[in-house]
Amino acid sequence: MATTRSEKDSMGSIDVPANQLWGAQTQRSLAHFRISQEKMPTELIHALALTKRAAAQVNMDLGLLPAERAKAIMRAADEVLDGAHPTEFPLAIWQTGSGTQTNMNMNEVLANRASELLGGARGNNRLVHPNDDVNKSQSSNDVFPTAMHVAAVMGVSEHLLPELKVLQKTLADKAEAYRDIVKIGRTHLQDATPLTLGQEISGWAAMLSHSVRHIEATLPHLCELALGGTAVGTGLNTHPEYAVRVANEIATLTRQPFITAPNKFESLGTCDALVHGHGALKGLAASLMKIANDVRWLSSGPRCGIGEISIPENEPGSSIMPGKVNPTQCEAMTMLCAQVMGNDVAINIGGASGNFELNVFRPLVIHNFLQSVRLLADGMRGFNEHCALGIEPNRDRITQLLNESLMLVTALNTHIGYDKAAEIAKKAHKEGLTLKAAAMALGYLTDAEFDEWVRPEDMVGSMKK
């Protein structure tokens, strides 16, 4: 039995593995772009299959594609969407910047599979043509940007935002639970005036609430689809109703509010929607890094650190120090946030590098965008389940550090003035005295006045409620 078959494209014939559905252009790309290990993301492949399905449906409805072929293409696309044929999409991210080779990879796979579904063969004698049928009314230049937006919206809406909202609620619940625990605040990594543990955590929860709104604000632009613009945005070789209809079909299939882009020249020539969208993801990464760093600092110890909170002990932390447990979820979170920030730089460069009617950094952009979505969604789920839900206050340590802080002297500002209060703090620090002892030694207030005026629970403001 032959192990290869001949496939033909505009450059001639080439042998491809007989057991694979792809064709000539995919085989050429495999030969020419043997670069690293990064392959086209599965989310993008599925979005591309969905786009091809929608195009076949609309082309059939408009009378542009015979029903028999259109339905076979749709069945083949559904197989891809259901997880079949995962080895048929082997191409590297590092290929043509328009994604043409991956578009043709999908066209060839669907054409050969549709031919089989119709009782035909693979290869040059197939019953469905990759360009004339599967790619009808399309160009790589509008199909690939469309698939990018579909994959991005689906990833953000169905994976990232749900995990973000769960983590935000966990922190909001913790803020409420610990609203009455007064602790020392810190600025510049130095002691500051008191606040409650609930107030501190409420800041984290608010950061994530803002991130939800920032990310959601980027979705309308991402829901604009380039399909129908064809090669340069003019819609050459498409039916007048095609662009609107195919966007509506994609919206129906995904249950997302996709629309046809009002200006296809912008859709083809830029990656602005993804640049903007990833900017919001980078903002989320910045917030998560701050939260994770605060958590690991506050839980540092167990005996020689701050130790105001405890977090779950999930696994041994050292191969040499017995009993050591580390804040591993915080470390994983900060690392993935750093990667997202790096991805943002690459996306910005890619987005800024379009020329004339087409941006040709698209595989780079979508690879990094979808990686960031996966990292953030998975990271937030793990951080929530294995860290945030288990945050508990160490009340004795909180009280100890609160009572030792020299910054409680700030409560005296309105009674004896800043200069005298500063003198008390300096004397206490230099001579190892309590604030009360230093104040009384200087003769600035009585024992009773100190106890009345320096009350940490009265220093946390109206926000305690």
UniProtKB/Swiss-Prot annotation:
Site feature: Important for catalytic activity: E331
Keyword check for Cytoplasm: yes
Sample GO molecular function, one term: fumarate hydratase activity
Compartments reported by the entry: Cytoplasm
Reactions catalysed according to its record: (S)-malate = fumarate + H2O
Catalytic center residues: H188 (proton donor/acceptor), S318
Annotated signal sequence range: none
EC id: 4.2.1.2
GO cellular component, one term: cytoplasm
Lyase recorded as keyword: yes
CDD domains: Fumarase_classII (cd01362)
Pathway listed: Carbohydrate metabolism; tricarboxylic acid cycle; (S)-malate from fumarate: step 1/1
Top-level taxonomic group: Bacteria
Alphabetical list of Gene3D superfamilies matching this protein: Fumarase/aspartase (C-terminal domain), Fumarase/aspartase (Central domain), Fumarase/aspartase (N-terminal domain)
Keywords: Cytoplasm, Lyase, Tricarboxylic acid cycle
Pfam family, one: FumaraseC_C
UniProt miscellaneous comment: There are 2 substrate-binding sites: the catalytic A site, and the non-catalytic B site that may play a role in the transfer of substrate or product between the active site and the solvent. Alternatively, the B site may bind allosteric effectors.
Subunit structure: Homotetramer.
Purpose of the protein: Involved in the TCA cycle. Catalyzes the stereospecific interconversion of fumarate to L-malate.
Family: Belongs to the class-II fumarase/aspartase family. Fumarase subfamily.
Protein name: Fumarate hydratase class II
